[in-house]
Amino acid sequence: CNINNLIFKLMKYVSKNKFLVLFSTLLLTALVLGSFVKKGDEVEVIMTTSKGELILKLYNQTPIHRDNFLKLINNQFYNGISFHRVIKNFMAQAGDPNSRDPEYTGSLGNNSEGETLPAEIYPSLFHKKGALAAARMGDQVNPEKRSSGSQFYIVQGKKYNRNQLTQMEARINQQLEGNLVGIFLKDSSNREYMNRVKVCQQNGWMDSLNVVIGEIKNMVLKDVDKFTFSEEQLKAYETVGGTPFLDNGYTVFGEVVSGIDIIDSICTSPTLPGDKPK
């Protein structure tokens, strides 16, 4: 059973008037990108899968990702694209052009259309159930958190209690510290600190290494606020669920406004090795 092929339509609800403009499958005109995307209005797209239809709202707060997504729809890029990775209680991912080919035997998830996009990460846009977010390469090779040009995922996630969320905050802050220290050490102007770190590591001087890392943290964290979940996030993760451990790491640029049950159906589908749906 092929659950994966995506078809997109564009729909636009003009605020208050409930006026619906429905465009043909995978057809998005320049008029929509220019005149119809107004302050206070948001574009919605219909995603059709063999499991049913979802309506996705695209955030104006993330215009780079919104416009790129609409451009791909306009160019019919998503014709025949499949969800190549689905994980129960986590998410469903799509956007690899190789997923169009049912005979493709290579690893999916390594290819995208176009250039990477600069991150548009905001605390108010988070990974609640139904969030639409951009996939990306990991921090080690992508410290700027730039997004894939075409790959996205939709969150299923699960519910968390307050204690679990508190522990998650601590882990996210540890990751943030590590990323900032890594960026600092890669900067050629900080070669002296990198040399000190290497000497400590080579000689097993852990106490001295901790002192150096402490000095670096004091510099890179002095103007950085610690990550904390807002009350809105806490309430959402406790009641509807999501993937809070991804917050502050990936660009969330939209959400499911209708058809959330379709994501549940996709994410609980039987899979092959590599989390590829059958």
Where are each of the predicted segments found?
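Cyclophilin-like peptidyl-prolyl cis-trans isomerases
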Residues: Y13-S15, L31-K278
